[in-house]
Amino acid sequence: RYQVPSRFVPKVVRVKQSFPAGEIYIVTGPHYLYYMLGEGQAIRYGVAVGAEGLNFRGSAMVGRKVEWPSWRPTQAMIEREPEKYGPLADGMEGGPNNPLGARAMYLYRDGRDTAYRIHGTPQPWTIGRSVSSGCIRMVNDHVIELYERVPVGARVTVYS
């Protein structure tokens, strides 16, 4: 079983007191997601982020949450890599080989689905890299833990 580097294992860390509990902050450069606990503490998780030019930036909210989500490539993904994504255009049921992994939190802005997600991955070796089509990937065990903590409506801010 693959072990992520120790710096990407979830860890409680100190943060500024001003960060409200229950919010998520993602810093793409060092590949970290912070779930704010309040009182100057957060849980820091290692993540994979979008490849150059594909990152989500700014603020959103968790619009919905799904266990073992189904997946369908976006039209932009199919156009960018037709040989890879074309055969999957009709989508894929949830399960251990699904690109969204064990859980997905769907990011919404202004009441609309952005098509970006915080989700698990069947490829944990990608954590710490900028390789996705823009989503925030987490180790399945880590995203399951975060999913249990985060309510629909939680604010998410991504800094690049």
Across the structure, where does each feature detected by a protein language model lie?
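Cell wall/extracellular polymer interaction/catalysis modules
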Residues: R1-R80, G94
